[in-house]
């Protein structure tokens, strides 16, 4: 079940110090995944389970994404045990600067609401996930978007039951528009998301982890 992404951008509250390529610890350039969570519950648990298997992942939460996590009883404190979590808190897009610092090699938006898909497809970057996606593309950083509304009939899990949705033509058109965006791969299921991530890992000469970063 999707919830709209807020129309006012915010950005940032981070649970730990952000890495930079010049840190004393020697953080390699473009060494991490940036995983953005929007206000969608569509295969949310499955998406997070895949993120947990990747090496070196930071979670970027929109305000709506943070609300939906709680609705689905996925608590921030639990996520912080396995990820660095960056939250939507100010209007200046501070976390996006980590893309300019060459911290991230891949931006994942999963799951992505139809609202976020529309923003990304039309070049609107007024939320943390849509801003991350836009700036990644400008830097030539590959993006993977797990779009929710990709078929005429979509069965999705709400917090209490399974729901059948029928995306409108405009939602389906926006997905196709998004597919044409540079440096963007659109996926439509957890299996496709896993396959896209596996291919990206292979490109980077990396492997799945058995635990989160």
Regions found by a protein language model. Give the residues of each.
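A cross-family phosphate/adenosyl-ligand binding-site feature
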Residues: 3-6, 14, 19-212
